[in-house]
Amino acid sequence: MTDFINTSASRSLENAVQDHFIAAEAPWSGIVRKGQTIRIEDSYGQQAIDTLFYRADDFGERYSNQDTMRAQGGAYIGTGTKIISNEGNVMLVMTADSCGRHDTSAGACSCESNTVRFGHGTKYLHACRDNFVLEVSKHGMSKRDIVPNINFFMNVPIKPNGEMTIVDGISAPGDYVELVAEMDVLCVISNCPQINNPCNGFDPTPIRVLIWDGEA
């Protein structure tokens, strides 16, 4: 684990209003209020972090990968990207990105996809979809509310013919993204447990999430 990196004079470990260490393979969820900044940190490097966002007062409005990609005209997100909802509203804006590669197309691993990709022996391995089902259930939602997600720090090159392949991640220990909330949002994370492809370097590790109030 690396030392804390400052991206703003007004943000430090001491003035974070929330600071969460999320175990390898575990889910997490929390509210990010309008104007707050959330940092999602890949503490040990090469760890995919599957993430969903919902409007906090109306879960029917949620992150839309197709609207986000359409609005920015590209498949990858980075500093300056506006995270768009299925209602066409800006949910968050990415204000910092020390890695530069995040996937919006490959979705979350599941028991079903593990079976298809890696064989029947992997069917019951822990998967992100299980994490999402568990975590959204705490907020009165079900698997019907799980939509295509962002995979922070996951490296999925897309060829001109549309072919995609999950390859080794490029994130280093301590790499992070920061997003400012443009509305109150529920953030739901699956710290990806996948061990059958290189999205986690075949070794899932803990991550960290910090939240700060808006700058004075």
Residues of each region from the PLM?
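Acidic, Ser/Thr/Pro
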Residues: 1-216
